């Protein structure tokens, strides 16, 4: 274990210079340090959530070059179809629905707020919905500020937001992989404003394409800075780039397994106590590498999902659904204690 790094992480003193040096460290010492930090900060529980993803449309005016989901099937769910999916989620014990969709030219703030109101009027379930880009887009379409949109969504019943659309928080990289998407400062503004009006979010990174480790490290420190200012980030979710069926596939085959594990370890070390929850996405990594990530800093495996269209369209072979029993078995096989949680990391049962 890297004792000095361990101590400085716990006291919140890790610098970007430290992180650069850690890239040259013995990887197994790096992983062990992250694992010991995980044990100190959150213990041996590994959490999961019973939830359902609902992607309500793949129509999108966006230009993200890493996306394999846009206009793939050409669908848009009606409100009744969305409600049917929420009802099915409730019947199977879901505590959360995660709702995201493409950016359309005919949906406005009231459409998004109406969707949340309709769900909340019929079901007692946590709504985790709409990426920062969706909020930015609906605000522009409706001629209102981001803060006005977020306040309207909160009144409608929005409980939390996914911190997706972060990709790499570097405008030079963003101009290549997602031209026209909200900028780094705009992503920070949407997320920080959400926290200010009482909507917690997650935070993500989508790595393994054209960016360098320097870009990744800067991204992690931007996220840490946001958390230190707002304290509204519930978890950090590294998303390894899925390279099939998109225009970035010729530039990268994605991150190596070792780089995936370095990402989890560095996130744990850099965030320390600031963001205690680091999620290993079984959809992105597969169950076996997700188990390894649990020994490299991660303490959560995400959700049951029930349906997952975005990673699947980009070549994920990990499936769309794992039952609670499946997730518990995966966690136990990694030598850890499975615990069900809600969206805000309250343990259930």
UniProtKB/Swiss-Prot annotation:
Q: Which organism is it from?
A: Methanocella arvoryzae (strain DSM 22066 / NBRC 105507 / MRE50)
| UniProt-recorded Gene Ontology molecular function terms | 4 iron, 4 sulfur cluster binding; 5-amino-6-(D-ribitylamino)uracil--L-tyrosine 4-hydroxyphenyl transferase activity; 7,8-didemethyl-8-hydroxy-5-deazariboflavin synthase activity; iron ion binding
Cross-referenced NCBIfam families, in alphabetical order?
CofH family radical SAM protein, F420_cofH, PRK07360.1
Please give the name of this protein: 5-amino-6-(D-ribitylamino)uracil--L-tyrosine 4-hydroxyphenyl transferase
Reaction(s) catalysed by this chain, per the record, are:
5-amino-6-(D-ribitylamino)uracil + L-tyrosine + S-adenosyl-L-methionine = 5-amino-5-(4-hydroxybenzyl)-6-(D-ribitylimino)-5,6-dihydrouracil + 2-iminoacetate + 5'-deoxyadenosine + L-methionine + H(+)
Enzyme class at the top of the EC tree: transferase
Q: Which residues bind [4Fe-4S] cluster?
A: 60, 64, 67
The function of this protein is: Catalyzes the radical-mediated synthesis of 5-amino-5-(4-hydroxybenzyl)-6-(D-ribitylimino)-5,6-dihydrouracil from 5-amino-6-(D-ribitylamino)uracil and L-tyrosine.
What InterPro entries does the database record attribute to this sequence?
Aldolase_TIM, CofH/MnqC-like_C, CofH_family, Elp3/MiaA/NifB-like_rSAM, F420, FO_synthase_su2, rSAM
């Amino acid at each position: 274990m890297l004792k000095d790094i361990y101590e400085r992480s716990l006291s919140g003193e890790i610098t970007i210079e430290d992180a650069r040096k850690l890239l040259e460290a013995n990887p197994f010492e790096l992983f062990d340090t992250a694992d010991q930090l995980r044990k100190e900060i959150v213990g041996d529980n590994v959490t999961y959530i019973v939830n359902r993803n609902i992607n309500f449309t793949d129509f999108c005016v966006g230009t993200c070059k890493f996306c394999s989901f846009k206009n793939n099937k050409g669908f848009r769910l009606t409100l009744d179809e969305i409600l049917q999916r929420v009802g099915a989620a409730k019947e199977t014990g879901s505590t959360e629905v995660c709702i995201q969709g493409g950016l359309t030219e005919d949906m406005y703030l009231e459409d998004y707020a109406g969707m949340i109101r309709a769900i909340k009027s019929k079901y007692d379930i946590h709504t985790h919905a709409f990426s920062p880009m969706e909020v930015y887009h609906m605000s522009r379409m409706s001629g209102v500020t981001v803060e006005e949109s977020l306040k309207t969504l909160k009144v409608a019943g929005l409980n939390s937001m996914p911190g997706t659309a972060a990709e790499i928080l570097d405008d030079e990289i963003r101009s290549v992989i997602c031209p026209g998407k909200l900028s780094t400062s705009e992503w920070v503004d949407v997320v920080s404003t959400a926290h200010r009006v009482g909507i917690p979010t997650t935070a993500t990174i989508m790595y393994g394409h054209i960016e360098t480790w320097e870009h990744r490290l800067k991204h992690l420190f931007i996220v840490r800075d946001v958390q230190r200012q707002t304290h509204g980030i519930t978890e950090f979710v590294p998303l390894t780039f899925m390279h099939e069926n998109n225009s970035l596939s010729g530039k990268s085959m994605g991150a190596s397994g070792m780089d995936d594990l370095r990402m989890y370890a560095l996130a744990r070390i850099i965030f320390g106590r600031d963001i205690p929850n680091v999620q290993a996405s079984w959809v992105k990594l597969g169950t076996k590498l997700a188990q390894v990530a649990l020994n490299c800093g991660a303490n959560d495996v995400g959700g049951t999902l029930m349906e997952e269209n975005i990673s699947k369209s980009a070549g994920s072979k990990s499936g769309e659904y794992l039952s609670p029993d499946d997730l518990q078995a995966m966690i136990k096989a990694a030598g850890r204690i499975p615990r069900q949680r809600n969206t805000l990391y309250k343990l259930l049962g």
